[in-house]
């Protein structure tokens, strides 16, 4: 989280990590898309990672986002993650560069060969303007350190195809908390969700625990609650209904009394009182009850 003046808010970050642990999440991803890695300095990114590992070590697995414009930069962040005891690393293909599928494979191969940590491939077409094909994901699964794929394409059919192609080889994280997702997991073993900000954790954690325990009726109950939250806040392409995704998320967290902090430029804060009231009403309808409906500055 950032303070209102744009500085890194270390105390809020520690409090947020403790909140995630209280929610019994199964892992924490640091410096991903929601973590605004693009507006942090290298020193800040390393500090954020160090705090997360120190706060959660031994309790919750910590994966560090290494997103950057070059493989060399990713390697440096990956080496730092290994040195502080992180459990794994994640990155998208380089943004803006529009690499080919062969270039995507070469990029991940460089990272996998250089950093001795479990590696998660992050497919995020909306943020990178490239979509990693299933064939390329199959090739990447052959790299020794690649253990998982985070598919944020928003394409449910492709996620199902990815799960089928990678079953028994690497884990696949996508959007599975719905009836179709349950069917995909039952058939191919999708591993879970990685949600920005953890707003859905009160519904997502018990959903997966019920599913893994074989209690499908209870899983469907939690799924319905989670789906309601998503429908109220998120569009099918992972854009958000009330503001840009991270601005909306942080405003929602503040409304709920959570230490979400503020965004940094180029993102703008969600401050319009009428929009905040609508966001607060959506949270309340989803079963997450705001502490305040007057503003998002708590």
Predicted features and spans:
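Active-site beta->alpha loop and helix N-cap motifs at the rims of alpha/beta catalytic domains
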Residues: 1-131, 268
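Short, amphipathic alpha-helical "lid/cap" segments that border enzyme active or binding sites
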Residues: 10, 14-17, 134, 273-283
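A general structural signal for well-ordered alpha-helical segments in protein cores
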Residues: 13, 45, 49, 74, ...
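Short, solvent-exposed alpha-helical surface patches in well-structured domains
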Residues: 15, 47, 139, 218-222, ...
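Short Gly/charged-rich anion-binding patches and loops
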Residues: 15, 76, 106-107, 135-136, ...
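Catalytic alpha/beta core domains of metabolic enzymes, predominantly
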Residues: 113, 125-235
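Structured C-terminal cap/extension of enzyme domains
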Residues: 181-298
């Amino acid at each position: 989280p950032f303070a209102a003046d744009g500085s890194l808010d270390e105390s809020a970050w520690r409090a947020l990590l403790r909140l995630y642990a209280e929610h019994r999440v199964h892992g924490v991803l640091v410096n991903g898309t929601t973590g605004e890695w693009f507006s942090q300095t290298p020193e800040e990114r390393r500090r954020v990672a160090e705090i997360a590992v120190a706060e959660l070590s031994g309790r919750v697995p910590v994966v560090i986002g290494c997103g950057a414009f070059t493989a060399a930069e990713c390697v440096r962040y990956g080496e730092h993650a290994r040195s502080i005891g992180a459990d794994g690393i994640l990155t998208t293909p380089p943004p803006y560069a529009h690499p080919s599928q062969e270039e995507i494979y070469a990029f991940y191969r460089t990272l996998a060969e250089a950093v001795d940590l479990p590696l998660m491939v992050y497919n995020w077409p909306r943020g990178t303007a490239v979509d990693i094909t299933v064939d390329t994901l199959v090739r990447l699964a052959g790299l020794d350190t690649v253990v998982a794929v985070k598919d944020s394409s928003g394409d449910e059919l492709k996620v199902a195809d990815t799960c089928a192609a990678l079953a028994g080889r690497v884990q696949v994280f996508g959007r599975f908390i719905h009836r179709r997702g349950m069917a995909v997991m039952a058939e191919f073993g999708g591993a879970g969700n990685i949600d920005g900000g953890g707003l859905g954790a009160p519904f997502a954690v018990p959903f997966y625990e019920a599913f893994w325990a074989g209690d499908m009726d209870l899983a469907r109950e939690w799924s319905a609650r989670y789906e309601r939250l998503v429908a109220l806040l998120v569009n099918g392409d992972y854009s958000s209904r009330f503001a840009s995704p991270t601005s909306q998320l942080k405003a929602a967290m503040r409304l709920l009394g959570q230490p979400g902090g503020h965004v940094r430029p180029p993102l703008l804060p969600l401050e319009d009182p009428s929009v905040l009231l609508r966001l607060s009403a959506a949270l309340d309808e989803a079963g997450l009850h705001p502490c305040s409906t007057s503003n998002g500055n708590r």
